[in-house]
A protein has these predicted regions:
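Short, charged amphipathic recognition helices of the HTH superfamily
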Residues: 2-12
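Short, solvent-exposed positions on alpha-helices
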Residues: 6, 23, 117, 195-198
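Acidic/histidine-rich catalytic cores and adjacent linkers
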Residues: 171-221
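Short phosphate-engaging motifs
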Residues: 4, 125-126, 192
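Short acidic (Asp/Glu) and glycine-rich catalytic loops that position anionic groups and cofactors
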Residues: 83, 143, 161, 205-213
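Conserved beta-strand -> loop -> alpha-helix junction used to position metal-binding or nucleic-acid-contacting
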Residues: 117-124, 129-167
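RNase H-like nuclease fold core
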Residues: 11, 15-120, 124, 128, ...
């Protein structure tokens, strides 16, 4: 990600009071890179029950020494045996639906034929990118992301009460019950925070996919 072996050597000396030459670091890198390449291209199981897709953003130095933001895209899957496996890590300048389309295509090329449920954030076009490669996959938008995005538009003095009311929606026992609770939240807060309520209604079908499953699976999702 743009950090030279010499810079890494200085970092070890500064942070850990340990001398590690640039040549040694280069030799370690040369040994590790083939293993990383093999891991990234390894064949995967044909079917995964659930996959979580998200990005973590970091500040790194580019080739010119400038501090830039890079995203590491992570795909964590649960196979038919219930085993969790990190299927891939992908680096990009930013998170976008087009890049996720490339990620989905890579998974397909490595042997994945079906994903039952994909859990993702609310990025526009994300579900379409997934279903263009895996058309039968159910896409569940991340409720935590939705809550975080919602609370940004709620006044600080109302946030605690609003979150309590919102919990009756995503914590309901069924989709019908959740919709009834959303109507009540709308009646109470809709005039004050119409953008928030509209966001929940616009994303409703994707936010409530998990209601069709048992409580144990809902908790896992």
């Amino acid at each position: 990600l743009g950090t030279s072996t010499r810079d890494i050597s200085k970092y070890f000396e500064r942070e850990f009071n340990t001398t590690l030459s640039a040549e040694t670091i280069s030799a370690i890198t040369d040994r590790v890179l083939p293993e990383i390449t093999a891991w990234k291209s390894r064949m995967l199981d044909p079917v995964y029950a659930i996959c979580w897709l998200d990005a973590i953003h970091y500040k790194v130095k580019d080739d010119k020494g400038r501090a830039v933001t890079r995203a590491i895209y992570n795909v964590l899957g649960v196979n038919k045996s219930g085993h969790k496996d990190l299927l891939g890590m992908y680096i990009s300048e930013s998170e976008g639906a087009n890049f996720w389309l490339d990620v989905m295509t890579d998974l397909q090329n490595r042997g994945v034929r079906d994903i039952l449920i994909c859990c993702v954030d609310g990025l526009k076009g994300f579900p379409d990118a997934i279903q263009s490669v895996f058309p039968e996959t159910s896409v569940q938008l991340c409720v935590v992301h939705q809550i975080r995005n919602s609370i940004k538009y709620v006044g600080s003095k109302h946030q605690k009460e609003f979150l309590k009311d919102l919990k009756t929606v995503y914590g309901a026992v069924s989709k019908d019950s959740a919709l009834a609770q959303l109507d009540m939240v709308d009646e109470k807060w809709g005039e004050m925070y119409p953008i928030v309520i509209k966001s929940w209604r616009d994303n409703w079908e994707r936010l409530t996919e998990y209601f069709q499953y048992t409580p144990a699976i809902r908790k896992l999702i």
